[in-house]
Amino acid sequence: MKIIENILSAEDIQVFKKYWADNHQHAYINGKPEGVPPGIGVHDHIDRRLLVKENTQAYSILENIVNTHFPGENYFWGNFQRQVTSHSLHVDEFGKDRPDMTHTIIFALDDQPKFKAIIFKELFNSCQDIEPYMEEKLKGPKISNISKTEDLDHCADWRDLTRNYCDWLELEGIFTYKAGDAVLFDTNQIHVTSYWNKYPEFQSRDLVQIHVGKRSPNSYSDQTQIQKGEPIPDLTDIDIR
């Protein structure tokens, strides 16, 4: 995990916000991935995602970042997300069955200390591997009390609310949203969004995310990996500005 400060300028942020404003009608619904432990407050509808299309200003910004931090890498997949539900523990399915290393970068578009990404050290091939692992981990002692210091209510074990899955995972770090900053981590690391839904002043949360590396045909860029949501649209013939 690495936090990169000021990777986006104020002008870059406005480009992404305008990209969403102009094209949000092309966004698709992202549902809850299979295999995520059934915590409290987890719903099927997580967010709406708008793919960042080539030959746009938004794409050029991301392409320059990839070329700077991953020289020689020729593939990335980016999207603008408007989240309506705090994402529970998961890994990014872009890395499922990956032939080589893959990375995720999350970009903050706003200053908001109540918005956080919490990254743990454990690695999984896909979300379907998480629940059986956690069932075994819960048989042993917890290794932290992070659920007492961070907003992680949605990761509580619904069968026993005194237990929180995150307390059985090894923390790597916490990324607090500051406009223009980003966090880089292994796509297959388990991570979670802080439970911002508990604060009534927030109806949604915006971010930009990219995945970098050579993906497997089994990754979620293929429509079969979107669970309980809409298929990813083919943007080839869609006029996006």
Task: Please annotate each region the language model reported.
Residues 191-197:
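Short, Lys/Arg- and Gly-enriched loop/turn segments at beta-strand edges
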Residues 2-11, 15, 216-221, 226-241:
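Peripheral, non-catalytic segments flanking oxidoreductase cores
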Residues 83-182, 188, 200-234:
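Catalytic core of non-heme Fe(II) oxygenases with the double-stranded beta-helix
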Residues 1-72, 77, 84-89, 117:
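Non-heme Fe(II)/2-oxoglutarate
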Residues 27-28, 191, 219:
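Secondary-structure transition/capping residues
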